Amino acid sequence: MLALYISSGIIGGLIILYLFISFNVYWVIFHSPNKQQKKYGDFPNDPSLSQSYDLYIDLVKKLQNEKYENVYITSYDKLKLRGRYYHSNDNAPIALCFHGFRGTPIRDFCGGYQILKERGFNVLLVDERAHINSKGHTITFGVKESKDATSWINYLINRFGKDTKILLVGISMGGYIVANTIINEDIPNNVFGAILDCPYHSPIEILKHSCVNKLHIPWWLGGTLLRSAAFIFGHFSFYKEKYQLTNKLAKVNFIVIHGDNDSIVPCQFSDNLLLANKEARKYVFKGAEHGVSYLVDKELYKKCVNDFINENLK
C-alpha cells in the first residue's frame, strides 16, 4: 500500500510539473498582456538598413498623423476587436490589413499604407485579438485570427454595401491569417485579391523552426509542450492547420512577397502557399530581412503591388 501511495505521489508530482512547464510555455509564447506596444515598434537589428531608419520613422509619423475612425466588431467568441479605418474616397475599394506576431499595424503597414492611399483605396488596419486595443490575451498564430478576418470582411460588406471590393493584405503572421482566410469556400466574392508579405504556411512549421533552430530544443519535447500549452491554457489547437493550406485551393488570386535573408520566417516557408493557386506568384527581395522588403526596395515593392491590383481589380 505504501508503494502505491509513493508511486501515486510521484505520478501526481510529475503531472503538476508538466502542467507548470506547459503554463510557462503558454505564458511566454501565446499569452499577450494586451498592453500598448512601443510607439514605433521594433526596428530590425540589421546594419544594412541603418540608412532606412529615417525613412521608417518618417513613414510611421505620416501614418500616425492620418485621420482615422475607430471601428469595432465582436468576434465569434465574444471578444471586442478594434480597427483603424482610413477613408480616402467614397465607393473606393478597401484594403483590409493584418499585422504580424506581437506587431503593430502602424509599424507593419507604414509603407504599404502609402501605396494603397496613392491608389485611392480606403484602408482598415486591424488590431488583431490580444494586440493593442483589441480584447483577448491569447495569440493563436492565425487559427482564431482567421475567423476574425472573416468577421471583418462581413463588417465591411454590411457597412459599405454588397458591391464593395476588398483587398486582403497580411504581413508575417498576418500573411498566414490572410492565406488561411482565402481558402474558405464561403469567402465572399467581394474579396478580389490578397497580398502576403513574408508569410508562413503552417503554425506548426514556424513554431518548429523557432524551437529547433533558435532555442535548440528537440521537437519531440518542444512540440509536445507547445501543443499542450495551446490546448490546455489557450483553448485552441493548431495541429489540424498543418496541411490545410496545401490541401485546399484558394478562390482568390494572391501574390507572395518575401526577403531571401529572412531569419524569422525563412523565405522557403512561403513556397507551399503557391500550391493553393496555380496563378499565384512570388517576388523575392534580395537581402531583405523579415518584413522589411519595402524598405530594401521601395520602387520594386510598389510595382509588385500595383501590377497585382491592376490585374485583379475589375
Language-model region placement:
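An N-terminal hydrophobic leader/cap segment in hydrolases
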Residues: 8-74
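The serine-hydrolase catalytic nucleophile loop
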Residues: 101-115
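Catalytic nucleophile-loop/oxyanion-hole region of alpha/beta-hydrolase
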Residues: 105, 131-165
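Conserved alpha/beta-hydrolase
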Residues: 116-135
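Hydrolase active-site cap/lid region
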Residues: 183-238
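Short beta-strand/loop motif that positions the catalytic acidic residue
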Residues: 249-250, 255-258, 262
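Conserved alpha/beta-hydrolase "acid-adjacent" motif
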Residues: 263-269
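Catalytic histidine-centered segment of alpha/beta-hydrolase-like enzymes
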Residues: 288-302
